[in-house]
């Protein structure tokens, strides 16, 4: 099958959204499909190889004929739907609710009302679209099971972990900082480790910080963490908590409708779900500090849950089957 991923007007850079698209494209190449990434400019992505053919669009003649073309960002939809029919059946792959790029009404008008078939990456996003009167299909990106797995036995010391991200306040990294401060004031065996795309913030409460770690460093990092804090409130399918769970970290999240964790976190089974306020969040983290048996039970269940969601290969095969239904 010939597949085009359109990143027109959005581009590729060192961020989670670009990484997901590139890993999906690479997986489809490995599955013997012809895959292209259609871009408005030069790729700024340096986190790994791009196996798909990257095309910098100059004229429409640069675009190959294809079976399907997939818009991958809110701002790529308008440009993509104007492309020739020979580019294939048009899909939109929604992987977040990007209110930092558009208002909700703009999303409805420019993305949801566009004449494309909608794919989402999570239950939360599917429910959001349904509440607005739009149908969609769930295709998750999957995970790399060979990259992150349990390596060590954890000690009684508790290491809290989280994503440090200041660009979008909806990531709520401030909740992680607040939680660590509150619990460090009560317990002596607590540390906080964080990673992110920001340079080291040099905040005293953070005991260890990794800047843009590669897969090997990230795997080791997750294995040193006991409890992963995931307070984000505006996600599609939140990836770092899944990676942490593969290393048998226990995740604490919230019941925010777009937490991005409802696909894989079931309260007290595969993680802990706090109410969507910071006091409840701190209380759930403290439960895990005080109860190592609960941590042990949930950590095993959590890893199994992420494995059950499937590998990248399994999920991209599902995507291809969906494409085949519309060709």
Predicted feature descriptions by range:
Residues 250-255:
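Short hydrophobic beta-strand element within catalytic cores of glycosyltransferases
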Residues 219, 241-246, 262-263:
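Short alpha-helical segment that forms part of, or immediately flanks, the ligand-binding pocket
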Residues 267-278, 287-292:
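Conserved acidic donor-binding segment of nucleotide-sugar-dependent glycosyltransferases
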Residues 280, 287, 294-309, 315-321:
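A short, well-ordered alpha-helix in the C-terminal region of glycosyltransferases
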Residues 233:
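Aromatic "clamp/platform" in nucleotide-sugar-dependent glycosyltransferases that forms part
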Residues 119, 151-171, 177-181:
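Conserved donor-binding/catalytic core segment of Leloir-type glycosyltransferases
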Residues 101-104, 130-131, 135-157:
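Acidic anion/phosphate-binding donor-loop and adjacent secondary structure
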Residues 59-63, 97-119, 125-127:
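Membrane-proximal helix-turn-helix segments that form the acceptor-binding/catalytic region
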């Amino acid at each position: 099958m010939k597949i085009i991923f359109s990143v027109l007007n959005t581009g590729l850079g060192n961020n989670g959204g670009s990484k997901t698209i590139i890993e999906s494209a690479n997986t489809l190449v490995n599955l013997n499909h012809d895959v292209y990434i259609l871009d408005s400019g030069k790729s700024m992505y340096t986190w790994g190889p791009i196996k798909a053919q990257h095309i910098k669009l100059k004229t429409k003649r640069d675009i190959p004929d294809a079976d399907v073309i997939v818009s991958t960002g809110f701002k790529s939809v308008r440009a993509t739907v104007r492309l020739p029919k020979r580019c294939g059946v048009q899909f939109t792959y929604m992987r977040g609710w990007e209110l930092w790029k558009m208002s909700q009404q703009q999303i409805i008008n420019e993305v949801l009302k566009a004449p494309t078939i909608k794919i989402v990456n999570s239950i939360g996003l599917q429910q959001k679209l349904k509440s607005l009167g739009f149908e969609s299909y769930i295709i998750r990106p999957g995970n790399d099971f060979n990259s992150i797995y349990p390596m060590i036995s954890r000690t009684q010391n508790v290491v809290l972990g989280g994503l440090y991200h200041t660009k979008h306040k909806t990531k709520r990294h401030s909740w992680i900082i607040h939680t660590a401060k509150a619990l460090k004031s009560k317990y002596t065996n607590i540390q906080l480790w964080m990673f992110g795309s920001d340079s080291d913030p040099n905040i005293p409460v953070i005991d260890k910080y990794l800047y843009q770690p590669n897969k090997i460093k990230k795997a080791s990092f997750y294995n040193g963490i006991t409890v992963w804090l995931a307070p984000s409130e505006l996600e599609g399918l939140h990836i770092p908590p899944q990676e942490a769970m593969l290393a048998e970290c226990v995740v604490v999240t919230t019941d925010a409708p777009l937490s991005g964790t409802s696909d894989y976190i079931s309260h007290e089974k595969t993680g802990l779900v706090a109410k969507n306020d910071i006091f409840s969040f701190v209380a759930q983290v403290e439960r895990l500090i005080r109860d190592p048996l609960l941590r042990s039970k949930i950590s095993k269940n959590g890893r199994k849950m992420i494995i059950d969601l499937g590998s990248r290969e399994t999920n991209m095969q599902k995507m291809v089957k969906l494409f085949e239904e519309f060709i």
